[in-house]
Amino acid sequence: LTAAALFLLPLAALAQGPVVGPATCEAERAVYEMTAPDTDDVWRIGLVPARNMASIASDLYLKLTTPRRDYWFTFSVSQGYAGISVFPVTDPYAEGGPRDLLGSPFGANPNGVTDPDILNALRFLTLDAELNIAFEPPMSGEEAPPYIMLPEIGRALWYDAAALTDDETADRDPMPRGVFRRTQCLVAPHPQAGP
């Protein structure tokens, strides 16, 4: 390689875009990852297809995998300017399917969490390559966005991890703030979940 070729190599790498893997990928096959600069730990998001609609907003479950455990969510879309939220549920692969972990009016669990601080931490954003934010959650068969953000979920995992899982041993689960980047596209989607 010549010196000029070595100089141009980083520019060519930037021109390819920030997403690793195929240029196109269906939402249910996408894998998203985020790392922290001071650790080798990886936080992952997968979008798992539901046998039926996971919620009125999407036919996908969101699975957040931290170095400590898995958390499962369904999507909710508010009218107006409120945007997209994720609501915690139990593992949809478990016998009997998922159960809401939130109380009324956001979930059907009579003993579920109703703390507004937790609810405010459950925002969900998808961003395209130009960093435009989508107004609807991902759906099966649609193009997977290159980026996902859960901007305040780290706060909920730190202070209220037990509210986001049915794991009774759940305690503080540290997670950095950042953006999940699409890093792979599975050959086949996750098996369908839910009842």
Where are these predicted regions, by residue range?
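Bacterial N-terminal signal peptides that target proteins for export
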Residues: L1-A4
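N-terminal signal peptide c-region/cleavage motif recognized by signal peptidases
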Residues: P10-A12
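N-terminal secretory signal peptides
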Residues: Q16-N109
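Surface-exposed, polar helix/loop patches in the mature regions of secreted/periplasmic/lumenal proteins
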Residues: Y81-I148
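Glycine-rich, aromatic-bearing surface loops/beta-hairpins
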Residues: L122-P195
